[in-house]
A protein has these predicted regions:
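Beta-strand cores of secreted/periplasmic/IMS beta-sandwich domains, seen most often
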Residues: 39-51, 99
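Active-site-proximal structural scaffolding
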Residues: 42, 57, 80, 92, ...
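Substrate/cofactor-recognition hotspot
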Residues: 123-153
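Beta-strand acidic-aromatic groove motif in beta-rich domains, primarily in extracellular
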Residues: 47-48, 52, 57-64, 110-114
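Extracellular carbohydrate recognition and processing domains
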Residues: 64-112, 121-127
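Short beta-strands within extracellular/lumenal beta-sheet-rich domains
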Residues: 19-44, 56-59, 82-87
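Extracellular glycan-recognition surfaces and repeat-rich motifs
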Residues: 1-21
Length: 153
């Protein structure tokens, strides 16, 4: 069963939706591991998700794998507040992919929090994620780079 929020001895985790999330703080920052999704087909222009936790690029992160290689990655911001982030994946349309959540850090902020991963075609400023992501909150999109974006509440 996924964690329902904040784990013992962890700062307050917020910003996730529903009753659970991926939270690798289990038994503190000393635990490590990966979680890999089943294969899926990229059917939309973007993949959006909520992310929080440690900022260790390549070590506490979420990755998109296409054809067996990492093509997109994102990391937390050393904060327990999960925020909307995502990737432009239009170039990978109709290809098979996997999501991998990585925690390979045992020190401070050695964990990652992920929730509500989904595919969407939305990108314009002020456009909310699709209803499955959260129809009750208005989002503004902030571009972070050519292939990454963030929704800000």
């Amino acid at each position: 069963k996924p964690p329902s929020g904040t784990l013992p001895n962890q700062m307050n985790v917020s910003g996730f939706l529903g009753n659970g999330l991926v939270n690798t703080y289990f038994r503190g920052d000393r635990t490590t591991g990966t979680l890999t999704s089943p294969e899926f087909t990229i059917q939309r222009k973007r993949i959006a998700f909520l992310i929080g936790g440690g900022r260790h690029p390549g070590k506490t992160c979420i990755e998109l794998h296409v054809d067996g290689r990492v093509v997109r990655t994102a990391t937390g911001q050393n904060n327990e507040l999960l925020q909307w982030r995502g990737w432009d994946v239009a170039e990978f349309g109709e290809r098979t992919a996997r999501i991998r959540i990585v925690d390979q850090v045992t020190g401070g902020w050695g964990h990652i929090n992920i929730d509500h991963i989904g595919q969407t075609d939305q990108r314009q400023v002020g456009t909310p994620p699709p209803p499955a992501l959260d129809p009750w909150t208005q989002y503004v999109q902030v571009l972070l780079g050519s292939n990454e974006f963030m929704f800000v509440r």
